[in-house]
Design a protein with these regions (language model features):
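Extended beta-strand/beta-hairpin segments
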Residues: 1-60, 71-80
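Mid-length scaffold segments of soluble, non-membrane domains
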Residues: 61-66
Length: 80
């Protein structure tokens, strides 16, 4: 069975506020192949809209799995 991992990194800059409404939710996901994704909380929870949020990532991962399964079946059946 395959193993997968990722590193999630966040830091609080010196002198930055750490209040619920204002702390920076920006962080990075780093994968084994070196890919880095700029992430944040969802905008509804004070995140940055221009970054990927965990809710979007779950949807994208699920859609990717479904697509790849469909394509694998189509390829095995030699459908074009």
């Amino acid at each position: 069975m395959s193993e997968y991992g990722a590193t999630v990194a966040w830091h609080l800059p010196p002198q930055a506020s750490f209040d619920y409404e204002t702390f920076d939710r920006s962080h990075e996901w780093t994968f084994a192949g070196g890919e880095v994704v700029q992430a944040s909380g969802s905008p509804e929870y004070f995140g940055t809209a221009s970054r990927v949020n965990p809710d979007e990532a779950v949807i994208a991962a699920t859609a990717s799995c479904h697509m790849l399964t469909f394509l694998s079946i189509a390829a095995k059946k030699r459908l074009r």
